[in-house]
């Protein structure tokens, strides 16, 4: 049985976590393009970030304000916050707003890409205007040849996002890895550790196995390994975060470790604060 660090060891109760965030101030979190920030003055070796989908029921300004509250400076963006239907100049203006807020844009998605060259080009144009260095996607396998060519043309990475047992094409990271391992290096994976676990696959082992094409990561926790509806705040479930972070450090992972907090969409901030605090605490402990 995997032994997880006690939540109390780091932060005590949820109220203590919230107090920790308030005391540390809005600017003392993740800082610097090469770091996940600091915890207790210790510089962290991974980029702990946030998927804007966690705040999908709130406007961009609120999402950026909450990121500041949590000290987050790395984010990926869903099209609810940077709409794909906006004209290019509007997309570029939103990009400028995000960057002015001190956020490093790590990518965008998830975008469902069909086997339609014209539509694929539109998605890459959108990504370019939005400042995405990476698109994470659930693509039609038949579209991969065109996606590969566009990735080369635009010099934008594309990471296939695994979606668990319900996915016809990409249930496990290994399914995506098999499709990209012989293609251009711009094609890789966005591993969703919760969806990975639900397939009966060890997320930690999957990260190590797919390490040379691991470009992005969605982080969540589950109380029950196979239950999509059992998501909880990070650290309250069964996923081995100490093992995950040790592995990511060991393989030299350079992408974002992005919290995707999908529950409590009408009031996500307390759970995001708790999750981010736990992630920082665990990372500080394993990096010592």
Language-model features: where?
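Histidine-acidic metal/acid-base catalytic patches
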Residues: 2-47, 57-71, 170-173, 177-191, ...
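Active-site acidic/histidine proton-transfer and metal-coordination neighborhood
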Residues: 14, 20-22, 40, 62-64, ...
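Beta-solenoid repeat scaffold
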Residues: 33, 95-96
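A short alpha-helix capping/helix-coil boundary motif
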Residues: 41-44, 72-76, 100-105, 125-128, ...
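Hydrophobic faces of well-ordered beta-strands that scaffold small-molecule active sites
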Residues: 46-51, 75-77, 105-110, 135-137, ...
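Active-site beta-loop-alpha junctions enriched in small/polar residues
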Residues: 51-55, 78-82, 110-113, 140, ...
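Glycine-rich, proline-tolerant flexible connector loops at the mouths of alpha/beta enzymes
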Residues: 76-93
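Short amphipathic alpha-helical segments at helix-loop
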Residues: 79, 86, 132, 226-229, ...
């Amino acid at each position: 049985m995997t032994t997880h660090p006690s939540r109390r060891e780091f932060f005590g109760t949820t109220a203590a976590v919230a107090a920790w965030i308030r005391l540390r101030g809005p600017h003392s979190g993740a800082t610097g393009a090469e770091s996940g920030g600091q915890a207790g003055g210790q510089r962290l070796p991974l980029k702990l970030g946030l998927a804007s989908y966690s705040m999908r029921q709130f406007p961009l300004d609120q999402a950026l304000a909450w990121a500041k509250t949590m000290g987050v400076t790395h984010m990926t963006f869903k099209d609810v916050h940077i709409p794909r239907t906006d004209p290019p100049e509007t997309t570029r203006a939103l990009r400028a707003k995000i960057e002015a807020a001190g956020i490093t844009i790590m990518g965008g998605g998830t975008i469902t890409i069909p086997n339609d060259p014209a539509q694929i080009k539109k998605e890459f144009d959108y990504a370019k205007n939005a400042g995405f260095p990476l698109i994470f996607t659930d693509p039609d396998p038949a579209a991969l040849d065109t996606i590969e060519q566009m990735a080369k043309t635009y010099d934008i990475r594309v990471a296939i996002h695994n979606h668990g047992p319900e996915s016809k094409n990409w249930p496990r990271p290994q399914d995506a890895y098999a499709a990209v391992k012989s293609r251009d290096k711009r094609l890789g994976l966005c591993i969703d550790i919760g969806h990975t676990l639900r397939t009966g696959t060890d997320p930690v082992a999957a990260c190590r196995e797919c390490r040379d094409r691991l470009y992005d990561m969605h982080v969540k926790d589950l109380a029950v390994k196979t239950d999509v509806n059992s998501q909880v705040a990070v650290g309250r479930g069964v996923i081995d975060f100490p093992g995950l972070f040790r592995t990511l450090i060991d393989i030299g992972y350079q992408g974002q470790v992005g919290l995707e907090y999908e529950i409590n969409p009408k009031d996500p901030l307390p759970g995001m604060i708790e999750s981010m605090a736990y992630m920082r605490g665990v990372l500080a402990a394993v990096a010592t």
